[in-house]
């Protein structure tokens, strides 16, 4: 709109003809110069007001959704149009000046000088306005760039502050955990649980408050605060749960033990009172008697009989249905007799006699062997009568031991002292048989 107004003002002088100029000169002669001057200034002020209004309307009607690049292009186009219109006006005014100099009188020349001054003022005003607009647009762009750089700096500083606050909160959490662990070791479990829970909650609140304050500075929506697990508290809670479970299991076991004892007492009472009477009592009470209950009652009666006769009871780890209590009692009696019966003095087996009379061909070896075997009397072993078979075996043993000693000595001399090859299986070993 502003460009169209400038073009109208520029094209207006083209329409003016020389006849019109002459009429103006005549009117100027008749009318005083002051009145004409005021009239011309009023028309100029009205045209300026119209231009301003049109500019304002154009600005209002522009869509806000246009991009910055489009606005820059428009400002450049407007400035180029203004320059063209100003050049066109300069050319027209120069042509008008030439005509007016040829055709005008002295009064006309004065008037044209005034017009030229006014036109030059208008041109200077339009140029200064375009410069001001350019300057304003540049200053706006600079301000925008400065504000963007400030926002970036602020965002960077905020991110640094967040990182610092997070690291501080982590360090505090670690300190809190270490303190809670050291306290929970020395204090009672029940007291430490309640105190550590209240303290941990208070510390969490204290930690969360500075976080919220630091994060509220940022325009972005703040995420929920991180609530990490307190390992010390978790361990204490797990320990408490385990203790509760152990208590429950212990109570169940105690109940089961009590029930078993009651059943055993009932079985013992049934055994003493007689199985037939017990079954009769159960039938009289109205309970259903199964064959298993009847068998258990019979076995209990047998065990009671055996206990009364022998004084030996069948242990609980045996199945009462599979073990006969009377036979078990007899076996136990025999075992006890064998264990606690004293040894008879004349009973010695042949193998015992052979070991006692063993001779290695060396007294020291014989003494060592008897000590190891627990043989006490040497004189009795020598004086006792020996059978022919035992004597032969003793002789054979002596010969075997002598041969072994000779072979060992030969092998030792060849391997260690003479340094023979291997174990000494050479022609010198043939002399071993003669020894």
From Swiss-Prot:
The annotated regions of Basic and acidic residues compositional bias extend over: 1-27, 66-111
This protein's record includes keyword Phosphoprotein: yes
Which keywords does the record carry? Acetylation, Coiled coil, Isopeptide bond, Phosphoprotein, Ubl conjugation
Q: Which residues form a coiled coil?
A: 230-270
Q: What residue spans carry the Basic residues bias annotation?
A: 35-51, 112-214
Q: Which InterPro entries match?
A: SMAP_dom (IPR028124)
Family annotation (PANTHER family): ARGININE_SERINE-RICH COILED-COIL PROTEIN 2
Q: What is this protein called?
A: Arginine/serine-rich coiled-coil protein 2
């Amino acid at each position: 709109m502003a460009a169209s107004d400038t073009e109208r003002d520029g094209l207006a002088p083209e329409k003016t003809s020389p006849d019109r100029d002459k009429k103006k000169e005549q009117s100027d002669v008749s009318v005083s110069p002051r009145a004409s001057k005021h009239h011309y200034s009023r028309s100029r002020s009205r045209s300026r007001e119209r231009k301003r209004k049109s500019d304002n309307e154009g600005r209002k009607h522009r869509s806000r959704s246009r991009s910055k690049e489009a606005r820059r292009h428009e400002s450049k186009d407007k400035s180029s149009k203004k320059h063209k219109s100003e050049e066109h006006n300069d050319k027209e005014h120069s042509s008008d000046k030439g005509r007016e100099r040829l055709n005008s009188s002295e009064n006309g020349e004065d008037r044209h000088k005034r017009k030229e001054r006014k036109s030059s003022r208008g041109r200077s005003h339009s140029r200064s306005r375009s410069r001001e607009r350019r300057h304003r647009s540049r200053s706006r762009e600079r301000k925008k760039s400065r504000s963007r750089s400030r926002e970036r700096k602020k965002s960077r500083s905020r991110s640094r502050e967040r990182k610092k606050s997070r690291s501080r909160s982590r360090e505090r959490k670690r300190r809190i955990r270490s303190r809670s662990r050291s306290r929970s070791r020395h204090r009672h479990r029940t007291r430490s649980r309640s105190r550590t829970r209240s303290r941990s909650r208070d510390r969490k609140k204290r930690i969360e408050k500075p976080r919220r304050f630091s994060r509220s500075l940022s325009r972005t929506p703040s995420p929920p605060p991180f609530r990490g697990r307190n390992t010390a508290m978790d361990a204490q809670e797990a320990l408490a749960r385990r203790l509760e479970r152990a208590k429950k299991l212990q109570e169940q076991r105690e109940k089961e033990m009590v029930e078993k004892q009651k059943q055993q007492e009932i079985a013992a009472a049934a055994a003493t009172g007689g199985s037939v009477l017990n079954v009769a009592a159960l039938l009289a009470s109205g309970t259903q008697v199964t064959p298993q209950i009847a068998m258990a009652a019979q076995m209990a009666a047998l065990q009671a009989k055996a206990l009364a006769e022998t004084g030996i009871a069948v242990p609980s780890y045996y199945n009462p249905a599979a073990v006969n209590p009377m036979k078990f009692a007899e076996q136990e009696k025999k075992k006890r007799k064998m264990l606690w019966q004293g040894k008879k003095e004349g009973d010695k087996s042949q193998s015992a006699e052979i070991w006692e009379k063993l001779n290695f061909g060396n007294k020291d070896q014989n003494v060592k062997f008897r000590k190891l075997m627990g043989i006490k009397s040497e004189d009795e072993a020598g004086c006792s009568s020996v059978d022919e078979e035992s004597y032969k075996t003793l002789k054979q043993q002596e010969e075997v031991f002598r041969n072994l000693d000779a072979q060992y000595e030969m092998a030792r001399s060849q391997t260690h002292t003479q340094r023979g090859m291997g174990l000494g299986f050479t022609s010198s070993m043939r002399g071993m048989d003669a020894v």
